[in-house]
Amino acid sequence: MRKREISLATGYLAAPFIREAKGYERHIDICWDAPEKDGLKYYKIYRSTDGRDFEPIGISRSWMRRYTDFIGTVGQRAWYRVSEVGYDLKESPLSEAVEAATRPMTDGELLDMVQEAQFRYYWDGAEPASGLARENIPGRGDMIAAGASGFGIMATIVGIDRGFVTRAEGVERFLKITSFLERADRFHGAYAHFMDGPTGKVETFFGGKDNGADLVETSFLFQGLLAARQYFDGDSQEEALIRSRIDRLWKEVEWSWFKQHDDSPYLYWHWSPDQHWVINHPLIGWNETMITYMLAIMSPTHGVAPGMYYSGWASQEKMAHDYRAGWGMTEDGSAYKNGNTYYGIKLDVGVSNGGPLFFTHYSFLGLDPHKVTDRYTNYFVNNRNIALINHRYCMQNQGGYAGYGYDCWGLTASDDAWTYHAREPQPYHDNGTMAPTGALASFPYTPSESMAALKNYYRNYGSFLWGEYGFRDAFNLSANWVSPLYMGLNQGPVVVMIENYRTGLIWDLFMSHPDVKRGLEALDAIR
């Protein structure tokens, strides 16, 4: 966040207006209106259980006009008041009191609750100049992430469709987003991993070599944009403008440039305007990058031959074999196809025993795995089996980690108590850290196991795991640790994949795009 002069004058502090208090099964959300003030340090929240005697229970940062009170029981009534506190620690008068109560909720209502809370990460928590997603909250306030923004675009479509915000509000947000994307830095049509929200300039967060295009992050972004292009199908000038902007941006991505040279069998992850291919990272599956090859094949202007799916993504070359064996630490799946059985589940495709669960999420938020079948497998079946292997590994709990079981599972990438790590169902990639997105973004594959995890995380761990933007990024009961962050790459897949499980909305939108249809037909022709 940019530094600014802070006024210590607090004479203008005033009681906020609480516009809503809403009870859920185990918590109550309150939100209020108050103008921005330089001298404001935080909001102070008070609660009463009798409507008369109020005690302070917490604070909310000056930019957050919402507070989640996790009560932990059903049928509890509470009253709330809020004040403003300045940098000199003087306090405004308290707001008028509002009341709400926790209540029993159906499974459908619990899904609504999770989707709406995690949607707010991208709506209330968006970087204001661009309307796009921050890498994490709290974090670097002006820095946005292209991939997380693509996930947020799809989550926002869900939010509009479910009435969390109006369509008119959604149109306004997407006009801001597409306007920003038109003026942001691009490199042969592709975006950087990180950008500055106010200026659109590259943020070299991962170092000076990563100062240009990131083709994988661009793919996640365009997976969302193509779904949005299909969603905003109205006759208004505003919706037509959204469509035309997305069409133009889509056609300007030079996917074929990222082959590095004309006879390359691979696409490459990065390109730098002054260091060119210095990172030199070819895209080889099985991992999260299938969508990159798919979009490159689908492009109507700068596409690659459909055969690159097999020469690059599913390559049988020695380099690809060594790449897979190296990161997987095994020969299993090093030829792309696997064929082994783990915990009683046969795995057609995947390195080791399937890898982290985000491999089954990121490429398949818009791309419907039911409708993707290659020479080796159908990807809904394969993704479901990867999720089931992950679930059974966690039930077996070889490491003896606290909490693991039928309703606590889903090893994937997240922060942990020590670093950021992509965890998977292997002892050497497991340290007891669980990210809620693992199980919850797997709803289409494992609805019963995912619902069990949702209820466990909310009902039993919600006092430390649930907050204003839904579930926090990760927790480790053995290490007595919970992440202080919400992460843009992990909040969105939960919203989107729950919706795909419930209605297939985002799958249907993305798959309806004419270029998507044409690209998949071209792939089917060489299967």
Protein language model regions, located:
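Extracellular low-complexity, O-glycosylation-prone stalks/linkers
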Residues: 37-56
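Extracellular fibronectin type III
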Residues: 2-7, 85-104
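Short S/T/G- and acidic-enriched coil/turn segments that sit immediately N-terminal to beta-strands
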Residues: 63-68
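Ser/Thr/Asn(+Pro)-rich, low-complexity disordered segments
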Residues: 99-527
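Short, solvent-exposed loop/linker segments at the N-terminal edge
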Residues: 20-24
